[in-house]
Amino acid sequence: MSPRIGLTQKMIVDAAAEIADQEGVNGVSLAALSKKMNVRPPSLYNHINGLQAIRAELAVRGLTKLFDQMADSVTERKGDSAMLSLAHAYVDFAIENPGYYEAALLKVHDKRTEIVSDQIVCLVTKLLIENGYASEKTAIHATRGLRSLLHGFTVLIAKEAFEREEDILESLSFSIRTFLSGLLINNKNIM
């Protein structure tokens, strides 16, 4: 069977991202994709190598878009300004792109995800070290702590769990500044 004219892998992954935004990554299936794209499921195999390949593409795109947004947010910034901007970029990305964000957290066996994940870790650890929040020895621990804090905020915002009237993004900034203050104290005590 020849590929449908005009159907591309990019179109399939774009459709998968739309489904993931609405239904989560588990909602992405070949049946859901074929229905959304108005093609028979076997037609998809002319362009992709199954559901795992689609998930891998979503993960790569998600991680790449997250990295780009984080890297852009810290251009020409230092200290708290850089870290706050990075934190808000992370949370904004996750809220605005729930499908890509969920896919970015998937464990897929694809070298590209490892490369982009390493770029994200290097970006954050470099900022933490350059701005005095961590040493080479503590940077990974600080990065994990920051990621956990940001992911927690992301999940709670997505679930609409913050029901009080206080501004959520102010709460995020407050939490990040508090976390960074703790890192500064910890880093000075270690040195």
Swiss-Prot record:
Q: Which SUPFAM superfamilies match?
A: Homeodomain-like, Tetracyclin repressor-like, C-terminal domain
Q: Could you give a GO molecular-function term held by this entry?
A: DNA binding
Q: Does the keyword DNA-binding apply?
A: yes
The family database entries (InterPro entries) matched by this protein are listed as: Homeodomain-like_sf, HTH_TetR, MT1864/Rv1816-like_C, Tet_transcr_reg_TetR-rel_C_sf
Instruction: Locate the transmembrane regions by residue number.
Output: none
State the DNA-binding region(s).
29-48
> Which top-level group of life is the source organism from?
Bacteria
> Which keywords are on file for this protein?
DNA-binding, Repressor, Transcription, Transcription regulation
Signal peptide (from-to): none
Q: Where would I find the HTH tetR-type domain in this sequence?
A: 6-66
Q: What is this protein called?
A: Uncharacterized HTH-type transcriptional regulator YobS
